[in-house]
């Protein structure tokens, strides 16, 4: 049985969308499958569009692998990049990320 992972997506206006999904999927997949507004995912998870940009809660950064060079280059395309910006298609959920909290940008690039 695959572990369930809970993720909170917080919209710019403060609305929170709690998603419970299986470990092993990407944050982007979890958002799309659960109807989270604000994750466009135009490229379908190929790290080629930056329309799945999220802000990871600073307390979670150490639990994530650092961005790849490709992800870092794509993040240069987002309008409001921050030190805790990530592309949700590049983060695979594990049981260690249960309770992960993310902020969604006001608009995707």
From Swiss-Prot:
UniProt entry tagged with the keyword Metal-binding: yes
Entry's cofactor comment: Binds 1 [2Fe-2S] cluster per subunit.
Superkingdom, taxonomy of origin: Bacteria
Cited Pfam families: Fer2
Required cofactor(s): [2Fe-2S] cluster
Gene Ontology MF terms in the entry: 2 iron, 2 sulfur cluster binding; electron transfer activity; ferredoxin hydrogenase activity; metal ion binding
All copies of domain 2Fe-2S ferredoxin-type, residue ranges: 3-108
GO biological process, one term: P450-containing electron transport chain
UniProt keyword terms in alphabetical order: 2Fe-2S, Iron, Iron-sulfur, Metal-binding
InterPro entries recorded: 2Fe-2S_ferredoxin-like_sf, 2Fe-2S_ferredoxin-type, Adrenodoxin-like, Adrenodoxin_Fe-S_BS, Beta-grasp_dom_sf
Cellular-component GO terms for this entry: cytosol
Keyword check for Metal-binding: yes
Binding site for [2Fe-2S] cluster: 43, 49, 52, 89
Stored SUPFAM superfamilies: 2Fe-2S ferredoxin-like
UniProt cross-references to Gene3D superfamilies, sorted A to Z: 3.10.20.30
Subunit comment: Monomer. Carbazole 1,9a-dioxygenase complex consists of a terminal oxygenase component CarAa, a ferredoxin reductase component fdr and a ferredoxin component CarAc.
Similarity comment: family membership: Belongs to the adrenodoxin/putidaredoxin family.
Function: Part of the multicomponent carbazole 1,9a-dioxygenase (CARDO), that converts carbazole (CAR) into 2-aminobiphenyl-2,3-diol. Acts as a mediator in the electron transfer from fdr to CarAa.
Name of the protein: Ferredoxin CarAc
